Amino acid sequence: MSAKNAKKQPNNSVEFLIDDDYGITEAIATLDNGDFGTRTIRFETGQLARQAGGSVTTYLDEDTMLLSTTTASNQPREGFDFFPLTVDVEERMYAAGKIPGSFFRREGRPSTEAILACRLIDRPLRPTFVKGLRNEVQVVVTVLSMDPEEYYDVVAINGASASTQLSGLPVSGPVGGVRMALIADDKHPKGQWVAFPNNEQHERALFEMVVAGRIVKKGRKDDVAIMMVEAGAGVNVAERIKEGAPAPQESTVAEGLEAAKPFIKSLCEAQAGLAERAAKETQEFPLFPPYGDDVYAAVEKAASKKLEKLLTIPGKQDRDDATNEYMEQVEAKLIEDFDDLDEADASKQIRNAFNAVMKDIVRTKILTEGFRIDGRGVTDIRDLGVEVDLIPRAHGSSLFERGETQILGVTTLDMLKMEQQIDSLTPVESKRYMHHYNFPPYSTGETGRVGSPKRREIGHGALAERALLPVIPSREDFPYAIRQVSEALGSNGSTSMGSVCASTLSLYNAGVPLKAPVAGIAMGLVSGEVNGKEKFVALTDILGAEDAFGDMDFKVAGTSEFITALQLDTKLDGIPSHVLADALEQARDARAAILDTMSEVIESPDEMSGLAPRITSVTIPVNKIGELIGPKGKTINAITEETGADVSIEEDGTVYISAATGEAADAAIDRVNSIANPQLPKVGERFLGTVVKTVAFGAFVSLTPGRDGLVHISKLGGDERIEKVEDVVNVGDKIQVEIADIDNRGKISLVPVEED
């Protein structure tokens, strides 16, 4: 990557407009993409949804328009020990000039894309609220207008942050979000980062990142603290690399983050300026800290020594059982010391303080001793288990284990007509590769609801899908719809990255010719002051507890050559660039080790299962598509009925044929070719035909789909004269015939012959 391109500062600008007559205030951020033009993000308040706590209409250029509102309940929620923030994205189909395709012709449950947008908003927005808030807060983003070539999700991050800034809620400064695409072309062979890429730019991007952050003070200067990253390689990145384009590696991520910061800064400045001019006064809300300082001190004194020993138990279940039992003992011992609190509140505070003490012990030992709960070093990976071909009738299956995390991967192949049709406001209309992730409650030894996927499951499935998508073969090379299911059977740290590994194994087992195998690893980071100096320790292959106790977790997936997906969330106000670089290198080493272990079991596609459909393709002239389909689908349906094969026709004339056996597929191909790529029959050729129609003067016999001939009544009786055609043959009868003549108009005359 070009350091020059990464460090060049865009010429962004922010301006404000106030219309006193209508009570409308605007903030306009103009973002400079250099040779790729500019994008304009406009925030407007005062016209729509005036009764909401905070309301902002956000525009991307002219045609994409979102309404964001933030509203809080008047009273805190009783019995809640967490902040009840909900984020909803409402896709209105009128935004794209469409009527919903559902039976009732109105919007129903949110699309997958809307749910993923909710998660993108929630992750950076939630940490900005003051700790201890228990009033219910609801952020609703409604898509009112949508340019069909644009994406609204990152615009929604900014809109949700802006409406929250105006709402009078106790929050820190605004959050800015930007999608960055690395585009390499003849003019920019090493790539240029482009903010808010449209769909055309998205499809040719080498790498793409959604980055959210906020402005923090670093001395006298403003800096941007990165809060969240979602990243992935372009769909065609493998081919682009072969053509000479730069591979997206660890340095690409660092450069992309730096390139995003000026855009985030401009977006935050626009929101802050809007808030200065139009925000409500911050209201007083009751806060409920998880525990008092006196409670923490008492628990620390009573429990820390024994906790240090209990936290060395390597097994998750044994460790959890031991610490939970000890927590009950500590609670029983201390609860009477806090008679100024009611019993329920005292119990809650003691338990929260116990967990906080446990967290501090783990963090301190990591920083000072390099100690981890299960005894590993900071760069060690847990024991790996790899197996394929577990499920008898599945087209491909695998089991991937990393410590106590256990993922079952299952692959199903089908015809292209089974690819998912997407009815949402994104430019993507269909998906050939579908990745579904399930996280049942028993995976953590608990009970709970099962059934339709929760937001977390949808998000994890999307991350794993993004990790695999760059290595999925093209539809021309592998004309199948692919459904990959990841079943989290056991969970103790990063089931999403375990799903990536299990999917590679399962896809190979199903015979899918991946461009390269992909593995994923979850990383953590712990920071703190040791001997007067700030220290950062990156952890490889984090446990669930290390995820909860750490300052940052990021998941990295990729091949041995390039990164395919990355997800990062941090609680820190900025990560030093050298710390992030070292952590990414540590992740690459772990990824390589996992790929080596996987390759010992399977390193290339197996033969396809005999239970998987056989799909072949043939190309026909576009002007023959109608003839192949036939009136009301008559011809194509006849091919399906006669051969047992399914036939799917693409707009470019590619015909995909799926059948249970090779013989059925060959028969269907012959039928298709006889219609669309015909070779005229010759006099003397014999066919076993089907009588399709009888008339007074003879019987019409189908030789091949779309090509019939006539047996005259005089030829049906042999040497005998017959009065009625139906005395000899009826519709549906099979009859052996020979072509006697073909006239100038192509009409075929047939005569019955004895079967050979």
UniProtKB/Swiss-Prot annotation:
It catalyses: RNA(n+1) + phosphate = RNA(n) + a ribonucleoside 5'-diphosphate. Keywords: Cytoplasm, Magnesium, Metal-binding, Nucleotidyltransferase, RNA-binding, Transferase. It is found in: Cytoplasm. InterPro entries: ExoRNase_PH_dom1 (IPR001247), ExoRNase_PH_dom2_sf (IPR036345), GPSI/PNP (IPR014069), KH_dom (IPR004087), KH_dom_type_1 (IPR004088), KH_dom_type_1_sf (IPR036612), NA-bd_OB-fold (IPR012340), PNPase (IPR012162). GO terms for molecular function: 3'-5'-RNA exonuclease activity; magnesium ion binding; polyribonucleotide nucleotidyltransferase activity; RNA binding. GO terms for cellular component: cytosol. It holds the Pfam family S1. Residues 684-753 form the S1 motif domain. Coiled coil: none annotated. Residues 613-672 form the KH domain. Its cofactor is Mg(2+). Its main location: cytoplasm. Its EC number is 2.7.7.8. One of its GO terms (biological process) is RNA processing. The keyword Cytoplasm applies. SMART domains: KH (SM00322), S1 (SM00316). The keyword Membrane does not apply. HAMAP family: PNPase. Belongs to the polyribonucleotide nucleotidyltransferase family. Involved in mRNA degradation. Catalyzes the phosphorolysis of single-stranded polyribonucleotides processively in the 3'- to 5'-direction. This is Polyribonucleotide nucleotidyltransferase. It comes from Corynebacterium aurimucosum (strain ATCC 700975 / DSM 44827 / CIP 107346 / CN-1) (Corynebacterium nigricans). The gene is pnp.
